Amino acid sequence: MHPRTLDEDLLSILAHGTLSIEGRMVDASNATLFGTVELDGVEVACVYKPTAGERPLWDFPDGSLGLREVAAYEVSAALGWNLVPPTAWREDGPYGQGMAQVWVVSPEGPESEPGAGLVDVVPAGQTPSGWIQIIEAHDHVGQPVALIHADDPSLRQMTVLDAVINNADRKGGHVLVGRVRVDDETSTFGVDHGVAFNEDEKLRTVLWGFAGDSIDEPLLADLERLNEGLLGELGDHLSELLTRRELIRTQRRVARLIRDARFPLPGDGWPSLPWPAF
């Protein structure tokens, strides 16, 4: 099993095509550039995050965030869930080496808003049917509100993926609905996985609605296949992106999820919600 069999054409374009920068996302904490990449007459819109633009963090090795984004794609692809847009490592670019990821085109409507119509903040006590309340708080003017997310199968997958990769920053705005190819149907994607795979437990997410629930059998079967891959070819490939200790901890998290067969609960030693939530 090797994840590069998925989206091989897009990965090749991302890694080897000619990259042209068209703009910058000014709200991002690290340099996040929007552009196009072209190879053999095929052009793809993408996000490019050069290593040189990464802000140093006390709890992650310098220059490693882009590699973690690639690793998150590899794990998602190995699970067969395709929750992470195709993401590849570039050895060169306008600002040096870094990761390139296919741009997710969102449709008009709620899916284009932060949270993609799947994560939201509503007045307290007004959680609609089919949604799960995570926490009550107060907004900027002191009104009581609730953070909620949909009871959606794609979010169950994303919750498991975040537990596997130890995602420290699953904000509502990191959940997208859209497509990466013009002829695709819209689907759910997760982005911004630079602060994942830490060897210490750092899971922070807005998707706590399934905490403690049993993990569905199909998801457990996918985790079993992932576990086999981590002990083989996939693990060998991820060893080029992560440290040995990080890879071992990833294997242990997968084994624990399979053993417990339950969605994880918030931990005590680390804030369980990202801030801001969007």
Which sequence ranges carry the predicted segments?
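Conserved ATP-binding subdomain of kinase catalytic cores across diverse folds
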Residues: I13-D139, L161-A168, R179, V191
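Acidic-enriched, low-complexity/disordered segments with a strong bias for Aspartate over Glutamate
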Residues: D7-D9, D27, D40, D59-D62, ...
